[in-house]
């Protein structure tokens, strides 16, 4: 049986997964490629609002998924290698299958 703490940990994991999936949906890793960009540049290239993109990028930094230095964001070697469309090792297929099943329990009500 899961403890209260275990259940809260699972909820936290879901929140982190949703942050990563949102970054993939907006092609954040491909927009960054090997570049160093400010949040306003990423927002412009992804056609998103600056405030929301700043929150997303900073959440990714807090999770260790992106790097940030003086308000400049960059991919980590892992995010470039596997989640950037220009990388020869791009592996988005599995993640996209997971994204397709995100809403499968929304139809319960």
Model-assigned labels for residue ranges:
Residues 1-109:
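N-terminal accessory segments
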């Amino acid at each position: 049986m899961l403890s209260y703490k275990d259940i809260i940990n699972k909820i936290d994991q879901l929140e982190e997964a949703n942050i990563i999936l949102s970054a993939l949906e907006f092609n954040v890793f491909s927009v960054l490629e090997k570049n160093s960009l400010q949040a306003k540049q990423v927002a412009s290239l992804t056609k998103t609002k600056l405030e929301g993109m700043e929150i997303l990028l900073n959440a990714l930094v807090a999770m260790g998924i992106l790097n940030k230095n003086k308000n400049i964001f960059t991919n980590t070697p892992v995010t470039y290698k596997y989640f950037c469309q220009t990388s020869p090792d791009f592996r988005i297929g599995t993640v996209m299958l997971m994204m397709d099943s995100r809403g499968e329990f929304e139809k319960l009500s």
